[in-house]
């Protein structure tokens, strides 16, 4: 079980520090008014949502985190399984679902790779150019399609309100150095954001070096046609992959290109299209470049049209059409392609201050003639004393990636006979808003899966084999408290307990699905001790299935105003030895420090 002494230590320190900063402030924003774009037919405040959703404002304190994974870790229901820092090959799962069962979006457009879901978090947009991260807990296939079994994560780019220039440079442990640049221009009817960043490290052990580069340009324009947004982005990541895929000192390099165009014609109709291309070069043994080698190039196209209308007072109908194509050329997998089209609708009736009810249905047709139907229903009910009850049910599905189907190397074998996986998800919960500064939630959830895709083997002498598991289900409880003490201090706590049916393995070893946390507790304290200084302290204690618990404590301190803004980020302050993926060791205590030069001028 989780050793709560770690949490007690942080709470004791926190209470002492808060006493210094206590003061009343009417400017603190109510917790319940934060708006999410996920889980509903229209953007909605968290206080009115029938689903569990988390929103991170990545522009509020831009120097506190090094990567998007650091933001996501503060949610106890989100499990980040990282192989290296700086966003190098990270897996994400929600509520115990596998990393392949979580859909990642960028400005509402799919970022999934037809090759493998290991690359879903290969975001080509620099962290500084993002504005928010929305996380939906539970199935979302009715609105978002394949892969949204365990949850959905949507990264949204930043919309500037003033001209800005930011230049940043830093250095730290393990030979790390980082640079970033961002420029923003704002006109009367347009805006432009250009950003780039680079992160390099010689590695904390041999063959764990990395170099990541990201660049993007984001253009917004208002015209008689409506509001247009064009996002162009690319990334390049090269890294040592020691023990990533077995007992080999491997090496890998990936590149990504993304183009997304969104056209909001009026308050009702939106059209969007996106193109994503991803390449991957993999050497099984780094010191043998002429040995076992794979090269993959996959691309995907997506087009969508949405219409949202108020059909009568307080009732909204959302309808949409989507078309998606995937294609891959690979030295290992061969050449393959597939496409699918979908139509969906969701109706929602909301009575202000009383509650809401919604229902939706999606019909999706895949090449080859397979139809998938994805229904959902949700409801909320407000009770006296600021209590809100909520419940939802939904169906999610996922088609296998090409790695799942066709891959073959000395350690891993695909399976061309794999069936698509699916799940019914149910949840019920209660939210409480005793004051505008406090929000508390408790949620019970259950997921009944069918044909879950995992890689299994009888013993360590055998290769991993892709297979469908039957009879797998998860049940759990998640809780969270967000307390905005005053304008200078905020406390956040979350805890998720998870259990599941393990008989699905039938005595086999599991590579991915059974690496989920059975206990995950998170505590975060955000504090501004004096004007412009910002301190963020984060503690996570995780216990994975059939493993011992481990604590990881991170701290960051930065200046958040002025032209020159020094910062320091300390990771794994407790110097814990741990791995988030079996046998892939994570770094011990490390730090990065530097300075940012920033200018902001409003028109």
Regions found by a protein language model. Give the residues of each.
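N-terminal periplasmic "start-of-domain" segments of outer-membrane beta-barrel proteins
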Residues: 32-69, 91, 99
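Extracytoplasmic beta-strand/coil segments of soluble accessory domains associated
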Residues: 38, 69, 73-109, 131
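Short acidic/polar hinge/loop motifs at secondary-structure boundaries
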Residues: 110-137, 156-158
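Short strand-turn segments of transmembrane beta-barrel domains in outer membranes
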Residues: 140, 152, 156-185, 195-206
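Conserved C-terminal beta-signal and adjacent last beta-strands/turns
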Residues: 182, 220-223, 391, 512-603
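Flexible loop and strand-edge segments within Gram-negative outer membrane beta-barrel domains
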Residues: 201-216, 225-300, 412
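Outer-membrane beta-barrel signature, preferentially recognizing the C-terminal barrel domain
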Residues: 245-266, 296-298, 382, 395-449, ...
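Gram-negative outer-membrane beta-barrel transporters
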Residues: 318, 351-354, 445-448, 468-542, ...
């Amino acid at each position: 079980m989780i050793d709560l002494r770690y949490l007690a230590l942080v709470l004791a320190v926190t209470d002492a520090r808060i006493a210094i900063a206590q003061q009343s402030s009417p400017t603190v924003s109510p917790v319940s008014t934060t708006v999410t774009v996920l889980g509903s037919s229209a953007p909605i405040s968290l206080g009115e949502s029938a689903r569990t959703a988390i929103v991170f404002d990545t522009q509020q304190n831009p120097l506190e985190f090094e990567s998007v994974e650091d933001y996501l870790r503060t949610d106890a229901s989100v499990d980040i399984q990282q192989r290296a820092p700086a966003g190098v090959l990270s897996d994400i799962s929600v509520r115990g679902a596998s990393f392949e069962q979580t859909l990642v979006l960028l400005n509402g457009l799919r970022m999934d790779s037809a090759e493998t879901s290991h690359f879903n978090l290969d975001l080509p947009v620099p962290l500084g150019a993002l504005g928010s991260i929305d996380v939906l807990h539970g199935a979302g296939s009715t609105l978002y399609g394949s892969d949204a079994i365990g949850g959905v994560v949507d990264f949204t780019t930043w919309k500037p309100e003033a001209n800005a220039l930011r230049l940043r440079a830093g250095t730290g442990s393990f030979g790390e150095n980082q640079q970033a640049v961002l420029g923003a221009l704002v006109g009367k009817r347009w805006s432009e954001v250009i950003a780039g960043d680079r992160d390099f490290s010689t590695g904390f052990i041999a063959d764990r070096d990395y170099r990541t580069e990201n660049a993007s340009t984001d253009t917004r324009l208002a015209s008689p046609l409506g509001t247009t947004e064009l996002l162009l982005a690319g990334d390049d990541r090269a890294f040592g992959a020691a023990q990533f895929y077995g007992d080999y000192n491997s090496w890998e390099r990936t590149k990504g290109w993304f183009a997304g165009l969104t056209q909001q014609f009026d308050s009702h109709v939106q059209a969007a299209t996106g193109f994503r291309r991803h390449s991957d070069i993999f050497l099984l043994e780094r010191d043998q470049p002429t040995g076992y080698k794979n090269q993959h190039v996959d691309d995907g196209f997506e087009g969508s049209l949405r219409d949202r209308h108020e059909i009568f007072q307080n009732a909204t109908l959302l309808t949409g059409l989507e078309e998606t194509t995937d294609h891959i050329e690979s030295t290992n997998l061969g050449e393959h392609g597939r496409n699918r089209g979908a139509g969906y609708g969701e109706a929602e009736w909301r009575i202000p201050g009383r509650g809401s009810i919604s229902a939706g249905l999606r019909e999706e047709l895949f090449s080859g003639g397979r139809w998938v139907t994805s229904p959902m229903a949700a409801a909320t009910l407000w009770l006296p004393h600021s209590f809100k009850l909520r419940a939802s049910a939904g169906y999610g599905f996922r088609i296998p990636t090409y790695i799942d189907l066709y891959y073959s190397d000395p350690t891993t074998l695909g399976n061309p006979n794999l069936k698509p996986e699916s799940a019914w998800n149910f949840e019920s919960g209660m939210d409480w808003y005793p004051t505008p500064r406090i929000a508390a939630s408790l949620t019970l959830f259950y997921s009944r899966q069918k044909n879950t895709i995992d890689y299994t083997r009888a013993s360590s002498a055998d290769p991993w084999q892709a297979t469908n598991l039957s009879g797998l289900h998860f049940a759990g409880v998640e809780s969270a408290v967000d307390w905005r003490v005053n304008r200078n201090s905020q406390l956040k706590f979350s805890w998720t307990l998870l259990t599941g049916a393990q008989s699905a393995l039938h005595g086999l070893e599991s590579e991915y699905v059974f690496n989920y946390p059975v206990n995950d507790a998170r505590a975060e304290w955000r504090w501004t001790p004096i004007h412009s200084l910002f301190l963020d302290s984060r503690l996570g204690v995780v216990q994975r299935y059939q493993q011992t618990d481990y604590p990881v404590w991170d701290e960051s301190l930065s200046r958040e105003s002025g032209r020159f803004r020094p910062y320091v980020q300390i990771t794994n302050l407790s110097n814990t030895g741990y791995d988030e993926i079996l046998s892939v060791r994570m770094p011990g205590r490390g730090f990065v420090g530097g300075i940012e030069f920033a200018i902001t001028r409003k028109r």
